[in-house]
From Swiss-Prot:
GO-annotated cellular components: cytoplasm; plasma membrane
InterPro entries attached to this UniProt entry: AAA+_ATPase, Chromosome_initiator_DnaA, Chromosome_initiator_DnaA-like, Chromosome_initiator_DnaA_CS, DnaA_C, DnaA_dom, DnaA_N_dom, DnaA_N_sf
Organism for this UniProt entry: Acholeplasma laidlawii
Encoding gene (name): dnaA
Top-level division of the source organism's lineage: Bacteria
Residue numbers spanned by region Domain III, AAA+ region: 103-323
Protein name as it appears in the record: Chromosomal replication initiator protein DnaA
Amino acid sequence: MSPNSTLWQTILQDLEKLYNEETYNELFLPVTSTFKDQNGLLTMVVANEFLKNRINKLYIAKINELATKYSSTPVRLKFVSQEEVIEEPVADRKLTIDYRQGNLNSTYTFDSFVVGKSNMFAFRMAMKVADHPGAVANPFYIFGDVGLGKTHLMQAIGNYILDNDVEKRILYVKADNFIEDFVSLLSRNKNKTEEFNAKYKDIDVILVDDIQIMANASKTQMEFFKLFDYLYLNNKQIVITSDKPASQLTNIMPRLTTRFEAGLSVDIQIPELEHRISILKRKTATLDANLEVSEDILTFIASQFAANIREMEGALIRLISYAQTFNLEITMNVVEEALGAVLKTKKKTNDLNENNYDKIQSIVADYFQVSLPDLIGKKRHAKFTLPRHIAMYLIKLKYNIPYKTIGSLFNDRDHSTVLSACEKVERDMRMDSNLKFAVDSIVKK
């Protein structure tokens, strides 16, 4: 990773703490790493003009403050849209790939992946793909919410293949890095597509993480489409991850999404409590902390972080580090001391109090004069579906919890159903003033 990319990753860590999850995921996480460093000016790429203007207007001062804090030399950042970058000349940069390591994290293996009901099918199919790359499921498309193990499972495929065939050429690449490589090579000389294609085509297995980041990057999508077809026709294994099903991807060209759907799609769901406890036990063992963490404490931590395994493991690491630093036995009092700030922030930004969900459901039901059971239930008459969709939308808007979690509040509806409902309400509000008035009125209650 380049020094500029490292700087941005460090800034990202602070931005995640400073702003709510929705702002972080929508504005900052998809930003492509810098492609130019000129006299201390780092240029960052975002998907479109709207995101560029929003960041430059509302957040650039804080971002540059953090850049100054973490950089050893004077530096400032500016944000440009994807289309601006294509037209702006930059210095040449050779694209190099280390196939021996494939950009893989060696700790992401099948053995270290904790299997449960929520990821069993995805795990078993991943192992089949690793055993027979290019032959069983191609492309292999893994989707699910943030922090549930998609990257781990994807890289486990790569590590397994490398362990069993050192001659295999494997590449793991995040979608934003793919965009950065494309932009850097083509911004001066648009005829360099041959060099770009040659580097990426010379592989046996490609692992592309967070494909949704390519949204709106039309030129990059076209190049990826060409690469996809070449690899597929030559029986090279393609593995892709995303935060949503291929059919729900927005601003990704249909010719790509239909190809994603033509392979095998598997989802990783939110793990049940027992599964989360098992994950924590495995993590505790790998930390080799020589500290006993009781079942009750593991259960408490698991119950507080239902939707994001990465956050849950981070909380455990923080707890153990705190106990080691002050030479403490891990008790509930120590848990409160070590994780108090984390849990308080989590409650503030992502309140998981079910009664508050009930309150939104009740207010919406009263407004539309339908019963709560009908609002939550499966009746499909418009009298019930509209308020049901609005209730889903408002819960997502206020608490920003995973779509799967919202679905569990409405008779166990699935991720895609809730996502579709929320997008429909948001879309229809732009065209229907009566609907917007109704939603605004409910919000004021």
